[in-house]
């Protein structure tokens, strides 16, 4: 956990490493990009864990009862689509936060 905190603090320096001349607007833009990156990373990480758990449960269920394998596979694909939709919603929110930020106009 300490490594992740140190890693995110190191990213702040990268976000502010330009020569900008707009003052506060550059800080808002930098924090928007940093927040979008962190949010999308968390969403992708959570989605990957959820997809892994869903696949593991489906494989376990199919191994225990091979007769319901097709039904479990269909249910798993629906669950995967719902998990991936949450990550795509986060991506859309991140793009909106970067490109149409109300604090930058």
Curated annotation (Swiss-Prot):
Q: Which UniProt keywords apply?
A: ATP synthesis, Cell inner membrane, Cell membrane, CF(0), Hydrogen ion transport, Ion transport, Lipid-binding, Membrane, Transmembrane, Transmembrane helix, Transport
The membrane-spanning stretches of this chain are 32-52, 78-98
Protein name, as recorded: ATP synthase subunit c
What GO molecular function annotation could you give as one example from this UniProt entry?
A: lipid binding
Q: Does the keyword Nuclease apply?
A: no
Q: Which organism is it from?
A: Helicobacter pylori (strain ATCC 700392 / 26695)
Which InterPro entries does UniProt cross-reference here? Answer: ATP_synth_F0_csu, ATP_synth_F0_csu_DDCD_BS, ATP_synth_F0_csu_sf, ATPase_proteolipid_c-like_dom, F/V-ATP_Csub_sf
Task: Say which domain of life the source belongs to.
Answer: Bacteria
């Amino acid at each position: 956990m300490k490594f992740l905190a140190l890693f995110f603090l190191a990213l702040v320096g990268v976000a502010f490493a330009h020569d900008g001349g707009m003052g506060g607007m550059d800080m808002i833009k930098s924090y928007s990009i940093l927040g979008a990156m962190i949010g999308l990373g968390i969403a992708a990480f959570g989605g990957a864990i959820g997809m892994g758990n869903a696949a593991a449960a489906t494989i376990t269920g199919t191994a225990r009862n091979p007769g319901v394998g097709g039904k479990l596979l269909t249910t798993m694909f629906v669950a995967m689509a719902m998990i991936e939709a949450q990550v795509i919603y986060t991506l859309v929110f991140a793009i909106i936060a970067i490109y149409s930020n109300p604090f930058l106009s």
